[in-house]
């Protein structure tokens, strides 16, 4: 019987097992703020490491970067964020609740069975016309009496220095991409990379979202994993398809089922004016389909904008053909928090097993890919009298992996605890271990056990981490 996955179950497990806690909880919390606990930080770091491994370490084309969160204000003027990075807002005149007009429209589309529910690029007039014609009432009070739609800039503004004037105005970056674009020439010069090549970055971004929600899916502070891939104009669609396939396979190789993800290509009416193509990889969350990964062919728009505003030359001289051109950019942009949440949802399972006296025993298990699991193994001495030997096993394995140690409670309860946090292997040290140098290795997914020489355990774990 298929388990019903709900966000309530996922959130409860995350809170109870130390994956994710509400932010500032002892002070009543802060709306839509989340802290990654001991297991959560290991898990999310593993997600980031997996992305870096595939998109940087294993790619001869790509290099890394870590740019500053605070940047010169003119960067955001050039990119268009100061003038145009905004959401369409409207208030209910009756109950004073505030909503994003485009989200009201998209929610209505979804509720009425639309295959593609998007209002991207719609004007204020188009949004209001749709809301009025379809009688989309206020979700809070049920009245149809809204203010006019107005734009609200999403960037967090602050000041650098001791005086709060326009000369000291800075923003918390709303995306990591612009830090890559402004460093394009420096990276190309110092690495001697030839086009095509890419620059990858993982980092925090901030958006003053009006309607955040669904746990860590949409938050005001979030982490991005972005690649800006620079290629010769005319080869961009070929590279666009290459990176689409790479992103898709990354998710499948780490355990996502194909029926739970889909590739949605943007229609012409959705495309930005500068884009040749854009596709989103979406995941089927308990609350519906949600975007994980956006892959966009941004042409030469970004580099040209920065060249225009900075006065710096952003052209590339091809050493083979002596051609000069501004490279086109393919951008696969992935939310670290979103994809981490998707992996948690995908892994969650409840299995009905026969317990004592024929009663049904429900086993909660997280089928995380071992590469993503917070702990790769747990060392479980059968008795506290075996602690010395168990410590030796722990000391050896912890040099290579993040492993847990647990000697409290029955062995069955310890197995269940590790199942619930996704630990792939439980390694039991028993009294026979002292005689034969073997341990019992239990597999999380099928619960099968095998006796293994202590010196062979490392190889078993290493093999499981491949993807």
Swiss-Prot record:
Residue sites binding ATP per the record: 207-209, 217-222, 291-292, 335-338
Reactions accelerated catalytically: tRNA(Gly) + glycine + ATP = glycyl-tRNA(Gly) + AMP + diphosphate
Record flagged with keyword Aminoacyl-tRNA synthetase: yes
Source species of the chain: Clostridium perfringens (strain 13 / Type A)
Underlying gene: glyQS
Enzyme Commission no: 6.1.1.14
Alphabetized GO MF terms: ATP binding; catalytic activity, acting on a protein; glycine-tRNA ligase activity; protein dimerization activity; transferase activity
Pfam families linked: HGTP_anticodon, tRNA-synt_2b
Gene3D superfamilies: Anticodon-binding domain, Bira Bifunctional Protein, Domain 2
Residues binding substrate: 100, 175, 222-226, 331-335
Assigned GO CC terms: cytoplasm
Its biological purpose: Catalyzes the attachment of glycine to tRNA(Gly).
Example of a GO biological process term: glycyl-tRNA aminoacylation
Subcellular locations according to the entry: Cytoplasm
Protein name as annotated: Glycine--tRNA ligase
Alphabetical keyword list: Aminoacyl-tRNA synthetase, ATP-binding, Cytoplasm, Ligase, Nucleotide-binding, Protein biosynthesis
Subunit record text: Homodimer.
Domain of life: Bacteria
Family membership noted in the UniProt record: Belongs to the class-II aminoacyl-tRNA synthetase family.
Coiled-coil regions, chain positions: none
Keyword Cell wall biogenesis/degradation: no
Main location per the UniProt record: cytoplasm
């Amino acid at each position: 019987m298929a388990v019903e996955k709900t966000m309530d179950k996922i959130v409860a497990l995350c809170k109870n097992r130390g994956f994710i806690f509400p932010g500032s909880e002892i002070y009543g919390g802060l709306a839509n703020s989340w802290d990654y606990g001991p297991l959560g930080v290991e898990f999310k770091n593993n997600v980031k490491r997996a992305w870096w491994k595939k998109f940087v370490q294993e790619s001869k084309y790509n290099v890394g970067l870590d740019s500053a969160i605070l940047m010169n204000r003119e960067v955001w003027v050039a990119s268009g964020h100061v003038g145009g990075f905004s959401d369409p807002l409207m208030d209910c005149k009756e109950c004073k609740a505030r909503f994003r007009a485009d989200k009201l429209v998209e929610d209505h589309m979804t509720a009425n069975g639309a295959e593609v529910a998007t209002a991207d690029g719609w004007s204020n007039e188009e949004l209001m016309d749709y809301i009025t014609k379809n009688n989309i009432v206020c979700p809070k009070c049920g009245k149809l009496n809204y203010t006019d739609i107005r734009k609200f800039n999403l960037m967090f503004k602050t000041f650098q220095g001791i005086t709060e004037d326009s000369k000291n105005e800075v923003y918390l970056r709303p995306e990591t991409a612009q830090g890559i674009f402004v460093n394009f020439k420096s990276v190309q010069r110092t690495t001697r990379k030839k086009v095509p090549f890419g620059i990858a970055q993982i980092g925090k971004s901030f958006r003053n979202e009006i309607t955040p929600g669904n746990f860590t899916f949409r938050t005001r502070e979030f982490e991005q994993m972005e690649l800006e891939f620079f290629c010769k104009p005319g080869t961009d669609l070929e590279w666009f398809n290459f990176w689409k396939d790479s992103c898709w396979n990354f998710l499948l190789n780490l355990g996502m089922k194909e029926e739970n993800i889909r590739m949605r290509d943007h229609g012409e009416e959705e495309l930005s004016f500068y884009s040749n193509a854009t596709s989103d990889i979406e995941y089927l969350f308990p609350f519906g389909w949600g975007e994980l990964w956006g892959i966009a062919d941004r042409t030469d728009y970004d580099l040209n904008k920065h060249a225009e505003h900075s006065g710096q030359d952003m052209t590339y001289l091809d050493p083979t053909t002596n051609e000069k051109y501004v490279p086109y950019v393919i951008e696969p942009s992935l939310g670290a928090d979103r994809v981490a949440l998707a992996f948690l949802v995908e892994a969650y399972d409840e299995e009905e097993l026969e317990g004592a006296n024929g009663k049904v025993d429900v086993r909660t298990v997280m089928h995380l890919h071992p590469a993503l699991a917070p702990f790769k193994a747990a060392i479980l001495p059968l008795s506290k009298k075996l602690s010395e030997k168990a410590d030796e096993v722990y000391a050896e394995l912890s040099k290579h992996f993040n492993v847990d140690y647990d000697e409290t409670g029955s062995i069955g309860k310890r197995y269940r605890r590790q199942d619930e946090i996704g630990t792939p292997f439980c390694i039991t040290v028993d009294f026979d271990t002292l005689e034969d140098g073997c341990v019992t290795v239990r597999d999380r997914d099928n619960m099968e056990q095998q006796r293994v020489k202590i010196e062979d355990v490392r190889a078993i774990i290493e093999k499981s981490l491949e993807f």
